[in-house]
Structure formats: C-alpha cells, structure tokens
Amino acid sequence: MAAYNAPVSNCQFRLTHILPIPQRQGAPTDPFQMNAIRQQSDSAEPLRHDIRLLGRCLGEVIQACEGKRVYDTIETLRRTAVRFRRAGDPADDKLLQARVKQLRGNDPNSVARAFSYFLHLSNIAEDRDQNRRQRDRALAGAGPERGSLRQAIESLKAQGVNNARIRRLLSEACVMPVLTAHPTEVQRKSTLDVHREISSLLVQRERELTADELSELDLALIGQVATLWQTRMLRYTRLTVADEIENALSYYRSTFLNVIPRVYGDLARLLNREPVKPFTPPPPPLEPFLRMGSWIGGDRDGNPNVDAATLERALLRQATVLFEHYLQEVHALGAELSASTLLIEADPALLALADAGGDDSPHRRDEPYRRALIGIYARLAATARHLTGQELARRATVPAAPYDTPDALAADLAVIAASLSAHHGAPIARLRLSGLQQAVTVFGFHLATVDLRQSSDVHERVLAELFARAGDGIDGQAVDYLALDEAARVAVLRRELAHARPLASPWIAYSEETASELAVLRAAAAGRARYGRQAVLQSIVSHTETLSDLLEVLVLQKEAGLIAPPGETIAPGDGLMVVPLFETIPDLQRGPEIMAAWLDLPEVRQRVRLAQGDTQEVMLGYSDSNKDGGFLTSNWSLYQAERALVDVFSARSVRLRMFHGRGGSVGRGGGSSYDAILAQPPGTVAGQLRLTEQGEVIQSKYKDAEVGRWHLELLVAATLESSLAPQAAATSAEDAHMQQHAPAMSFMSELAQRTYRGLVYDTPGFADYFFAATPISEIAGLNIGSRPASRKKGQHIEDLRAIPWGFSWAQCRLMLTGWYGMGSAIEAYLETGAQGAPRSRRARLAQLREMASDWPAFRTLLSNMEMVLAKSDLAIAAGYAQLVPRRGLRERVFGAITAEHGRTLAMLRLLTRRELLADNPGLMASLRERFAYIDPLNYLQIELIKRHRAAQRRAGDDADIRVPRAIHLTINGIAAGLRNSD
C-alpha cells in the first residue's frame, strides 16, 4: 500500500503519499503528538520508507488473497481520495462518494479492511520511528529530549534541587497508571500480537543485512501482513470481563514487567553520584513509587458483569502471570550464574543460602549461585502453587516451603547481589538480577492494584436494605435510611461505625444487589490476605455528592471485615481508602466542601493518619464533567476544584493525591500527559499522581515496549518536575494569573456552558439527531467491551455513558466534545467583557492573548482544542447529518454546530494569530497523509449505515450480515486512524 520505487513484486498498490493537501487538516494521532513529525522533513525518510514497505506488503497480500478486481477497486478509491486531498477539487470528493455508494456484495468489507489495516500499519511505523529518533538523538550526542528523565533531572539540578531531595520525594511518591476496560477498545488481542511481530521485524531490518537476510525478513513481513489480513478483525461475541482481564495482562507480558524495572534502573543511574563501572556494585533498588493499577475485574459502576468472581479471577490471573515471569527470570539467572568456588570466593550468606536450597547434585557442588537459585526457584514455585493452586512453568527439582512475603524473596535476591558485588561478579547478570530485584519491590505477589468502584446510589440502596432488614434490632429502633436527610444519615452512619456489632446477618437472605456488594468486599478482604494489601487499596465512589456517600463505604467495609472493629488499633494499611469521584460540574464545585467535612470527622481523620499515612486520594472525572458542561466549563471546573482541594488539604496537613479520570480524547482530558501534568495548579501533584489509561490509548501507548517505556518515563519526569521545581515562584505566578484572569475564565465558562447545554440538553429533538447522525447505535452493537454503552435503555443523552458519547462524535469527525462553546465564550468576552475586565475590546483581546502565551493552564487548553479542531472535518460531518430524517431538526442542529465551529476557529486564529498547527507543519503534513485513508472509511460508514437502517426498517433486522460487520470494520479503521478518539 505504498508508492515506492522498489516494489516487492509487480503489485503497484500505493496507499501512502507525502503530499501537501489544502483545506482539511488534522491532529496528533498518537499520545506523544507524533514524535516522528516533530523533526525536520529531511529526517522523515526512514518513516516514509517503512510506511511504503508495509504498504507494498499489504498491496501484495490483497492482490493475492482477493484478486485483481478487488485490488483495483481499492486502488481506484485510494487514488480518488488522494487526488481530492491533493488539489481540493470538489468533483473528486463527489466522485469518491459516488464510487463508495456503488460498492456491493463483499466489496465494502474488503475496502474497509484494506484502509483500516493500512492505518494500523502506519501506526506501527510511526511508533517504530519514534523509537528510532530517540536512539538517533542519543547516538548523535544531542541534548536530552523534553520529557525524558535525563532532562528532568538536569533541569531540577540546575534549579538547585539535589539528589537527596529527589530521593526523599521518591520514597513517598506514587505514580500509577491505571488500566481500565472501556467500550472503545476495538482491536483484538490477536491483531495486537501480529502488530508486535511486524514492529520487531522492522527493527531487524535496520541492521546491516546480506541480500539473503533482507529477502528472508521481507518474506516474514509479508507473512505477518498476510496473517493480519487473514485474521478476523472483529469479535463475533461481546467481550467478557475475563477477556478484558487477559487483554490487559498481555501488556504486562509485552511491556510492563520488563520495562518498569528499566525505568527504575535508568533513574537510579541518573541519581548515582558516580558513573556505574563494570565491577562496582549497581545502584540499590529504588523505593517503589511507579506501580500499576487496574479497574478490570473491580469496576462495578454500571457493569452488571463485574462481581466477586471477576475480582477473584483478576487477582488470580495477575498473580499467575507475575509468578510465571518470576520463575522464568530465576531460571534464566541460574543458567547465567555459573561461577565456581574453585575460581572465585562467595559470601558466607550466599553459601548458607545455597546449602539451604536443597540441591545436592555433585555436578553443582562448586556452583553456589546456581544451587541458591535452585532453592529460590523451588520456593517461588511453592509460593505460586500455594497462591494460585497451579503448577507453573518447570517443576521444581527440590521440595521447598513457600515464601511468606515478597520481602523474603527480595532478601534472598539481595544475598546473591551482595555476594556478586563483593567478589568481582557485579557485571554478571547485572541487568537481569537488578531488574528482578526491582520487579519484586514493585509488583510484589499481586502485580497490579485492583481498584473497586461502585456508584453511590448502589451503596445507598444496600445500606437502606441492611437497615430495613435489621428492623428495630438497631439500638431498639428501626431506621428508614432513604427517608433521612443528609444530617441524619451522617449521624446514623457514624453511630454504626462506632458499634462493634454487625449490621448484616448471615441468617437473612438479602437481595441480589446487596448480597453481591457484600460479596465483592469480602472477596477484596480475602484477596488482600492472600496476595498482600497492595492487591486492593481503593474503593472509589462514583457520583459522590454528599458526605454520607463516603461514610456508607466505611460502614460496608466494617460489615465485610475490611477495617478494624471499633476499639481496636488501626494499623497502617488497614481497610480500603475511600476515594470520592467528583464527576459532574455541580459535584466538582461541591467537592472541596465535602472533603473538608470528611477530613474534619475525628474517626475519619484518625483513619487517614494511621491507616493511610496522612494521605487521601480524590478522583476527578473528565468525561462526565465534559458531557455535563462542555469542554471549557469542564476544564475550568476541574482546575478550580483542584486549587480549592489543595487549600483544604493543606489547612489540615493531609497529603492530597489526585486521581485523574482521563481518556484519550481531548474532551475526556486527553492530549499530552506530560504537558497536562506540568499545567496542573501548583501543589496538586507533590509526588502523588494516579491517572486512568483507557480504550484505544492503552494499545497506542503500551503495545510497543519502547513506546511504553517512553510514556512511563514521561509520567515520572513530569511528576518530578511538577513536584520539585521551586514552588514559590510557580505559586506566585499562578496566584497572579488567577487574580488577573479568573473573572475572564469564569465569564467564558458560564457562557460556554450555556451554549453547550443549549445545544445538547435544551434543543428539542437533539437526542434524536445524535442517535441518527452518529454511529452510536452501531457502536453499541460492536462487541468491544463488557460494559453496556448506556446506563438505561432508551435514547436519552443523560443515560448515555460519556465514553461512547465522545467516541461517537470522533467517528463522525466532529469531535464536538473538544471545542463546542469555546467560540461563543471568547467572542462574548471580547464584545462585552466580565465585571472588572479591561474596558476596550482591544485590551480584552490583549488579555486573552497574554493568557494564551503565559498561563500554562489556558495555553494547554487552547493547544488541545487546536489539535481537535485540526482533526475535525465539517464536510464529512455534513454527510452524517444527512442521516437525520427530519430536515428541520437536521438543519437546526447541524447549522448550530457549523456556526459554532466557524466561530471557534475564528476566535482561535484571533488569539494565536496563525492558522491551525502552523507552528507544527510536520505534524500537519503527517495528518494530511492519513486523511486520504480515513475519508473513504467515513464515506463508506455513512453509506452502510443508510443501508443497515433501511433494512432494519423493512424487516426489523438486517438480512445481509455483511453490512453491520462492514460498519464495524469502518469503526475499527477510523479509530485506528484517529488513535486518541475514545
């Protein structure tokens, strides 16, 4: 699928170009804003070469598998799309649409697969190019790249921050990406595995090769592309929670288990005062601060498929994968550490460990390291068998008792490391041993922390039933919990926390909902006892609106035996941290007040101090607040909430840990993670950061090990910089920005929310428009997640989940969640101003331009919006609008969207004084390449939706199953092309 002057065969299928294309523009297509196009154009040739190579392979596969007619059909569509993008002739656009409409039979599926797979292959090439560029920079001796650990450490040292201070922060820090399973992950694990193989082959092709070696690699590449083509892209059945658990675990095998210890090792070397020499001991393992979290198996909010059994399965499967890794690494160490006491000495502690290992083979009598590792392997195997009930990997050759804790395993590994260092063995197995040591401190016996999450209204109903079924057995009086006001509820819940007697009875048959909730909490208690407390640490309360929403979870924990009974000493790590999730605009505004009340309760403050180390986590929801109030109001409300929370926590000497519920799309808090962290208000990071990694973003960031390593490095570097850069100046500057610009932001936020809600919630028939003009109904039918797309049946915007809401707008190329309302807000401020604003329009414009250049929060907001606007395409969106049968509704809604889009573009140009992405021409050029391959998919999706819905109206179902499958293929391809669209 590429134009290249050295084709693999006679196939001339060309599906890539490097051409200037006017008019339609786009946005970054991966989480790193495409490192490949941040460089000068003359360094883009390796990327062009890889895309051409993969395109040729795909073209040859299509011609061989589907025949010349199908190949020619696809190539004709490609040429038409490229010609339109090159010259902007509307006639070519009409011709492209006409040719798409003529597709019949299985051709729509073949076309959708061809363009989708080309976009997948382009993503692989771009990820590989990013790795290549970073290596080239290092080889050239260039300065550290922005966002790298080296750049962060050097920057901090230049500002007077010494190593001791950095280490002190790391000893108390928490950086935790949290993988979530949301209904926007449209790629199968089978295809992701092939992607990794293709990436590996591209790496091998960069070596100096003989002609035969190159030929073999090219054949292997074609084989992998053929495998991709012959592998079913779609799932026939909806994902189960068990499937989602396995999908997530594949990223641990490919990336996290090996890459996270390397990130620690890189940081340790940067903090080491002296360069590491071959025979000097390696830096000791750092205190664990970078860990992984997961919602998969524990997130019950709106997912009836998650219960105690899925939580147990998640914990079991995580431990299984982890112990397989440990056993594999220990076995490999045994092969590497062949040192003989006939040639080198060993520490007494190492000799004792070897003697205790149980291996009495005369062939290894003089090999204490191997004998010690045989014993460690046996103990690990026994531990795995004890915790998982399975025999993993190779059977141990000697009997052994299991390890009680990860610390015991770490101690044995430390004995080996110390002996090697003391006897000229430091270079031997340095990377593997130090990596394993660090892995044990990070992953323990649990691998990742699984969060529990449930909606506050479920907790409310469960408590109401427990009180109702207890009757007057509660201190001689019945409690009608649902009838109580907030103050009475708080009083009742606090009374329950003070009583040792249980509220629930094992002799009462509770409703399915209540029984399930109690079972989940008991499963969490059992999991913590089995795998360690790190296995489950948080209980997140969705839709937190009141203080009682948090107290309810403490009472339920008491019923499940998770927290110490009243009167007993609260030990460190006791119970699960109750984490509020503030999602809507009103909840964000109430959040600081709720947290102040929470921390002021004596029993809560004692728990925070003793069990949680004076740390309290608060989660902020980006997607729901955006769906509720629109892009600007969501961002401004989040920003204000964070600042207010810092004040609340600082006044009470409690460490605040923010948990950012971000997604891939800008409307859900996406964009550059590095820039987003640095743009947080001063004091909100302070070494504490959790954030969700969701949907398509997981595979974009972590499918490739090196890309995953870079992203983790970005998170750590940004956390260090944000936490340790001199705070006084930053706080002073931020206070000045707030004092000067907060009235303008509040004015624009109110106007933007009014504009947004006026369209989405106050326009009669808007829900009908949305369900007709986007593929939301088709997305709901795609087997891409275990959780339903809507909370309730029916077509109501309020009931629709925020994630498929944003995903649908991305599919139709409007990206409405990332910009709508901004144009009206800026225009209104320029025309009328807020109270206390500069008097003249010119002065107000100067103020907004100053905000755009000097205030990180506003600058990042505009930058993210600019990327979204560049990616949107009103011409294609107009085709989706034609799916709305009511002309008046169509014209009213799409007319409002078009007007606001134009207004927002004009206001952005006015503030930035340039065209979209004019400061990043490489980025724009790369996006333009993609559009010629996304456009046909959009047009095909529109046509297929028309056919599908017409067939449903005629027969109540689609007689031709190929049509809905082809729609789903286009959804996959468009998501691959846009990447951060969930």
Curated annotation (Swiss-Prot):
Alphabetically ordered keywords of this record: Carbon dioxide fixation, Lyase, Magnesium
Taxonomic superkingdom: Bacteria
Gene Ontology terms for molecular function: magnesium ion binding; phosphoenolpyruvate carboxylase activity
EC numbers for this chain: 4.1.1.31
Reactions it catalyzes: oxaloacetate + phosphate = phosphoenolpyruvate + hydrogencarbonate
Active site: 182, 627
Cofactor or coenzyme needed: Mg(2+)
Pfam family, one: PEPcase
GO CC annotations on file: cytosol
GO biological process terms on file: carbon fixation; oxaloacetate metabolic process; tricarboxylic acid cycle
InterPro entries membership: PEP_COase, PEP_COase_bac/pln-type, PEP_COase_Lys_AS, PEPCASE_His_AS, Pyrv/PenolPyrv_kinase-like_dom
Similarity section: Belongs to the PEPCase type 1 family.
Function: Forms oxaloacetate, a four-carbon dicarboxylic acid source for the tricarboxylic acid cycle.
Database matches in HAMAP family: PEPcase_type1
UniProt cross-references to NCBIfam families, sorted A to Z: PRK00009.1
Entry protein name: Phosphoenolpyruvate carboxylase
